[in-house]
Curated annotation (Swiss-Prot):
Sequence similarity: Belongs to the glycosyl hydrolase 13 family. GlgB subfamily.
Name of the protein described by the UniProt record: 1,4-alpha-glucan branching enzyme GlgB
Entry-linked InterPro entries: A-amylase/branching_C (IPR006048), Branching_enzy (IPR037439), GlgB (IPR006407), GlgB_N_E_set_prok (IPR044143), Glyco_hydro_13_cat_dom (IPR006047), Glyco_hydro_13_N (IPR004193), Glyco_hydro_b (IPR013780), Glycoside_hydrolase_SF (IPR017853)
Reaction(s) catalysed (UniProt annotation): Transfers a segment of a (1->4)-alpha-D-glucan chain to a primary hydroxy group in a similar glucan chain
The keyword Transferase belongs to this UniProt entry's keyword annotation: yes
TM segment ranges: none
UniProt source species: Streptococcus pneumoniae serotype 4 (strain ATCC BAA-334 / TIGR4)
Role: Catalyzes the formation of the alpha-1,6-glucosidic linkages in glycogen by scission of a 1,4-alpha-linked oligosaccharide from growing alpha-1,4-glucan chains and the subsequent attachment of the oligosaccharide to the alpha-1,6 position.
Pathway: Glycan biosynthesis; glycogen biosynthesis
The EC number(s) this enzyme carries: 2.4.1.18
Enzyme class per UniProt: transferase
SUPFAM superfamilies cross-referenced by the UniProt entry: (Trans)glycosidases (SSF51445), E set domains (SSF81296), Glycosyl hydrolase domain (SSF51011)
Active site per UniProt: D304 (nucleophile), E355 (proton donor)
Keyword Transferase: yes
Length: 642
C-alpha cells in the first residue's frame, strides 16, 4: 500500500495497519538515512518535531501538512533511543506539547515523551502452539484464566514493578505449578497514572515502560506458549486519559473524541470517550488491536467497559439521546460488530471477550442475528449473585437459594465466562477470602466450596491473582501481593487446593467440552433450599459424566441421598474437605453402588456422607445394567426457560 492509498483508507476507516504509516519509521530518502515522522492533526495551524535531537527547541524542525490532515517530516537528526514529542499549534493559536499516538515506546513516568524505536523482527518459536490453537480452537477446550496486574504481582526491593524479563522467570513457572491454561493481563498499554491500573490509556501501540522493552514481552508470550499457556490482554477502546499532552483534543478540536460534549466526556471515570463513528478513529483502534495480536502473538483480547460503548446514559451525567430518542449508542454498536468481524476474519482462533453487564443486547451472537460477535461475555450477574450468597450467614441461605440456582435459567443465553476479577477485591469490597462467612476455618471451607462450584458450573473461568491462596487483605495496586500469607499452613494448603482443582478441571473433559448448551449439564436437584444443597451432572461428548453436589451450610449430612440417571458403582473423585487441603476428612467417601428406588423422577439413588460446607464430586467407576434407568424429566423444564 503506497502512502496515498494508506491515507485514503485511513479516512474511510479501512486502514487496519495504520501504525506502519503514522508514527516514526526508519527510512532512506535520496540516499540519506533517517526517520520519517507523521502525525494526524487535521485542524492544527502548525506542528513541529522536537526532542533530544533539537535540544527541545520548539521551532527547529517544522512539519508539512498534506491534503489529508497528516503532518510529515524526514530528518537525519533523530536516532534510535531519542525522546521526542510534537509541538502543536492548535486551531485557536494555543501551543502544546503532545505525544506521538503511534509510538511503540514511551519514556518512564512521569515523562510522556515517545522514544524513537524500530521494533526488531522476532524469529518466533511458537509455531506448534499456534498450529494447535488453529486446529483445536477454544470453544471445546479448557479455559481457566489467572488474571494478573503486571505491576503488582511481585515487586523489586526498591518498590519498582517486575519487568517481563523477571516475570518470565518467576510468573510462568508459577502458572505451570498452579495448572492454569491462560493468563490475562490488565492493560499493558502505556498509561500516565499507575493508579488507573492501565484503564486510562495514553499510548495505544506501546507497552508500558515500567514493564520493560517490547522484546521482553514477546519473549514472555513465547515462553508461555512453550508451556501451553495462552496469553490474553485487556484493551480499552471506549475511553482514554483526559491528560492535555495525550490524545485529548489533539489539534485543539475534537479529534479522537466526540464533537458532542455529553458524548465525549465520561464524568464517572474522568476520561474522554472515543468517537466510535469516526472513520479515522475506527482505523486507529482496529490497527491497534491487530498490532498487539501480530507483534505479540496474543491468544485473546478482553474488551473493557463494553456497556460504556453501548449506552449513551451509562455515565451518571447529562446525556444526548440517539437520533431515535433512545439510549443505544449506534456508533459503538456498529463499531463493535465491525471490530469482531475484522478480527474473526483474520484471527478466528483468537478469543474476543466482552466485559459487559447488561442483558439487552446479544453480546456473543453473530452480526446476522443482531449480536456483537464476541466469543465470550463475562457473567456479571452470576458473579454478583454467587458472592452475595457465600457472604451470607448460612442460617439465611435457604431463603436466598435462588441466588445459586437462578443462573441455570439463562446459563446458555450467551457464551459466558465466570469471573472473580480484580474489581471484586478492591474499594472496600474485601478479598475473596474475607468475603466468606464465618471464622477462619469456615472461610477457607467456603472458599474451597465456591471455587469448586465455579469450576463445575458451565462457562470458562477467571480468578484474580492472590485469590488462589486466600489472601486476606484487599488488592493494592502499588504493592506486591501478600506472599508472606503462604507461611501460614492454611494459606499454603489453599494454594495447593487451587492447583489441584485446576488440574482436576483440565483432566475432565465434561467440565469444558460442552459449555454452551444443555447437552453438557443435567440438573439433579435445584430445589433443596431447606438443606441448601445443590446437585447436578456435567456431561461430556463421549459419555463422561461427573456428579457434583454442593453443601452450602456447615452441617455434615450422613446418609445423604440423590437420584441418578445411570446405575453403577460410583467413586468420589473430589472432596473439598480433605485434610491435605485444610479440611478435616482424612480420606474420600468409600465407593458406593446405586440402589433402585424412586427419587423425584429418577429410579436410581446414591447415598453417601456429604461434608459440612463441602463439595463432593462423583464419577461412575463401572456401569451396571438396570431396567429402571431414566433421565430426569425436570431437565426439560430447565431447557424451556431458555
Amino acid at each position: 500500500m503506497d502512502n496515498r492509498e494508506a491515507l485514503k483508507t485511513f479516512m474511510t476507516g479501512e486502514n487496519f495497519y495504520l501504525q506502519h504509516y503514522l508514527g516514526a519509521h526508519r527510512e532512506e530518502l535520496n540516499g540519506e538515512h533517517g526517520y520519517t515522522f507523521r502525525v494526524w492533526a487535521p485542524n492544527a495551524q502548525a506542528v513541529h518535531l522536537v526532542g533530544d535531537f533539537t535540544n527541545w527547541i520548539e521551532n527547529q524542525i517544522p512539519m508539512v501538512r498534506n491534503d489529508f490532515g497528516v503532518w510529515e517530516v524526514f530528518t537525519n537528526m533523530a536516532q534510535e533511543g531519542h525522546i521526542y514529542k510534537y509541538h502543536v499549534t492548535r486551531q485557536n493559536g494555543h501551543q502544546l506539547m503532545k505525544i506521538d499516538p503511534f509510538a511503540v515506546r514511551y519514556e518512564a513516568r512521569p515523562g510522556t515523551g515517545a522514544i524513537v524505536t524500530e521494533l526488531p523482527e522476532k524469529k518466533w518459536k511458537d509455531g506448534l502452539w499456534l498450529a494447535r490453537r488453529k486446529r483445536w480452537g477454544f470453544e471445546e477446550r479448557p479455559v481457566n484464566i489467572y488474571e494478573v496486574h503486571a505491576g503488582s504481582w511481585k515487586r523489586n526491593s526498591d518498590g519498582s514493578p517486575y519487568s517481563f524479563a523477571q516475570l518470565k522467570d518467576e510468573l510462568i513457572p508459577y502458572l505451570v505449578e498452579m495448572n492454569y491454561t491462560h493468563i490475562e493481563f490488565m492493560p499493558l498499554m502505556s498509561h500516565p497514572l499507575g493508579l488507573s491500573w492501565g484503564y486510562q490509556l495514553m499510548g495505544y501501540f506501546a507497552l508500558e515502560h515500567a514493564y520493560g522493552r517490547p522484546e521482553e514481552f514477546q519473549d514472555f508470550v513465547e515462553e508461555c506458549h512453550t508451556h501451553n499457556i495462552g496469553v490474553i490482554v485487556d484493551w480499552v477502546p471506549g475511553h482514554f486519559t483526559i491528560n492535555d499532552d495525550a490524545l485529548a483534543y489533539y489539534d485543539g478540536t475534537p479529534t479522537f473524541e466526540y464533537q458532542d460534549h455529553n458524548k465525549a466526556h465520561n464524568h464517572g471515570w474522568g476520561a474522554l470517550n472515543f468517537d466510535l463513528g469516526k472513520n479515522e478513529v475506527q482505523s486507529f483502534l482496529i490497527s491497534c488491536i491487530k498490532h498487539w495480536i501480530d507483534v505479540y502473538h496474543l491468544d485473546g483480547i478482553r474488551v473493557d467497559a463494553v456497556s460504556n460503548m453501548l449506552y449513551l446514559d451509562y455515565d451518571d451525567a447529562p446525556w444526548t439521546p440517539n437520533k431515535d430518542g433512545g439510549n443505544l449508542n449506534y456508533e459503538g454498536y456498529y463499531f463493535l460488530q465491525r471490530l469482531n468481524e475484522v478480527i474473526k476474519l483474520e484471527y478466528p482462533d483468537v478469543m474476543m471477550i466482552a466485559e459487559e453487564s447488561s442483558s439487552a443486547i446479544k453480546i456473543t451472537g453473530m452480526k446476522e442475528i443482531g449480536g456483537l460477535g464476541f466469543d465470550y461475555k463475562w457473567n456479571m450477574g452470576w458473579m454478583n449473585d454467587i458472592l452475595r450468597f457465600y457472604e451470607e450467614d448460612p442460617i439465611y441461605r435457604k431463603y436466598d437459594f435462588n441466588l445459586v440456582t437462578f443462573s441455570f435459567m439463562y446459563v446458555f443465553k450467551e457464551n459466558y465466562l465466570l469471573p472473580f476479577s480484580h474489581d471484586e477485591v478492591v474499594h472496600g469490597k474485601k478479598s475473596m477470602m474475607h468475603k466468606m462467612w464465618g471464622d477462619r476455618y469456615n472461610q477457607f471451607a467456603g472458599l474451597r466450596n465456591l471455587y469448586t462450584y465455579q469450576i463445575c458450573h458451565p462457562g470458562k473461568k477467571l480468578l484474580f491473582m492472590g485469590s488462589e491462596y486466600g489472601q486476606f487483605l484487599e488488592w493494592k495496586s502499588e504493592e506486591q501481593l501478600e506472599w508472606s500469607n503462604l507461611e501460614d499452613p492454611m494459606n499454603a494448603k489453599m494454594k495447593y487446593f487451587a492447583s489441584q482443582l485446576n488440574q482436576f478441571y483440565k483432566d475432565h473433559r465434561c467440565l469444558w467440552e460442552i459449555d454452551t448448551s444443555y447437552d453438557g449439564i443435567e440438573i439433579i436437584d435445584a430445589d433443596n433450599r431447606d438443606q441448601s444443597v445443590l446437585s447436578f451432572i456435567r456431561k461430556g461428548k463421549k459419555g463422561e459424566m461427573l456428579v457434583c453436589i454442593f453443601n452450602m451450610v456447615p452441617v455434615e449430612r450422613k446418609d445423604f441421598t440423590i437420584g441418578l440417571p445411570v446405575a453403577g458403582i460410583y467413586e468420589e473423585v473430589w472432596n473439598t474437605e480433605l485434610e491435605e487441603w485444610g479440611g478435616v476428612w482424612k480420606e474420600h467417601n468409600q465407593t458406593v453402588q446405586t440402589q433402585e428406588g424412586l427419587w423425584k423422577d429418577y429410579e436410581q439413588t446414591l447415598t453417601f456422607t456429604l461434608p459440612a460446607m463441602g463439595a463432593s464430586v462423583w464419577k461412575i467407576k463401572r456401569r451396571l445394567k438396570s431396567t429402571k434407568t431414566v433421565t430426569n424429566k425436570n431437565q426439560k423444564g430447565v431447557e424451556n426457560e431458555k
